[in-house]
Amino acid sequence: FEKLWSKWLGVKYSVFVNSGSSANFLTMLAIKYLYGTGKVIVPPLTWNSDIVSVIKNDFKPVFVDINLNDLAMNNDEIIKKIDKNTKAVFLTHAQGFNGLTDKLINELKKRNIILIEDVCESHGAKHKNKKLGTFGFASNFSFYYAHHLSTIEGGMVCTNNKKFYETIKMLRGHGLLRECGNPSFENKIKKKI
């Protein structure tokens, strides 16, 4: 399922987890582990696990209000809230709407700020003919029974970053390195322990 999902979405790696909430939590934990903490810009209209995952992993949430036309954070206001301590933007694509603009994507790339896409309610939606969930450093999906695609429960973390992918696999597997499948990565982790 992970390989099929990656191919359908258009990313290199996908990791299936037990829920969209777990996808959010593991994403923030992996970012904390790999890059440290800081501020994360978040929307007030999202599922609570987006915000809880930020707080529980020692990041500081910074709220930006939504647009009424797409229910996503106002992209211009996101850019205004960015400061030297901003680590990431956790953007929710709500109800099948695209919450991205080229201006935001380019600004985040220019400033080297991580974009996390919550695509739990927008499977298959697009920005400029490219599926949502492929623009950021990571994207999270939910397969809860009330969402567009259901596995009854379940979630997915998607990325093109191999180091992040291996970290997510390790964290999903209770911290066991056997999940990684990369001896070089495993040795680096063992040296840290």
Where are each of the predicted segments found?
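Phosphate-binding glycine-rich loop
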Residues: 1-39, 53-55, 63-65
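Active-site region of PLP-dependent enzymes
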Residues: 122-128, 135-193
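Conserved SAM-binding loop
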Residues: 16, 42, 157
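Active-site nucleotide-sugar/metal-binding loop of Leloir-type enzymes
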Residues: 81, 131-134
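Solvent-exposed, non-membrane alpha-helical residues enriched in polar/charged side chains
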Residues: 2-6, 28-29, 52, 79, ...
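PLP-dependent aminotransferase-like
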Residues: 32-110, 114-119, 126
